[in-house]
């Protein structure tokens, strides 16, 4: 067995031992629902003036109207 193979074997062994000890210490327990909501909570953002808007409530000023784009097509943009 050469040095590289021995290093890989030791790395795999350390990973397996680490996973086993994390499981014994409760490292793989599922998150509680409130923890998941805290971690994945979306920050409130709004679409600035002049940007395309699919819904009025996403615009910073809550107003969205049809305007001509560079191709002459009518698209909804935040006012």
Curated annotation (Swiss-Prot):
The record marks 52, 69, 77 as: Critical for insecticidal activity. Its main location: secreted. Keywords: Calcium channel impairing toxin, Cleavage on pair of basic residues, Disulfide bond, Ion channel impairing toxin, Knottin, Secreted, Signal, Toxin, Voltage-gated calcium channel impairing toxin. It holds the Pfam family Omega-toxin. It is found in: Secreted. GO terms for molecular function: calcium channel inhibitor activity; toxin activity. GO terms for cellular component: extracellular region. It comes from the Eukaryota. Expressed by the venom gland. Disulfide bonds join 46-60, 53-64, 59-78. Residues 1-22 form the signal peptide. One of its GO terms (biological process) is defense response. Residues 23-40 form a propeptide. Inhibits insect, but not mammalian, voltage-gated calcium channels (Cav). Belongs to the neurotoxin 08 (Shiva) family. 01 (omega toxin) subfamily. The presence of a 'disulfide through disulfide knot' structurally defines this protein as a knottin. This is Omega-hexatoxin-Hi1d. It comes from Hadronyche infensa.
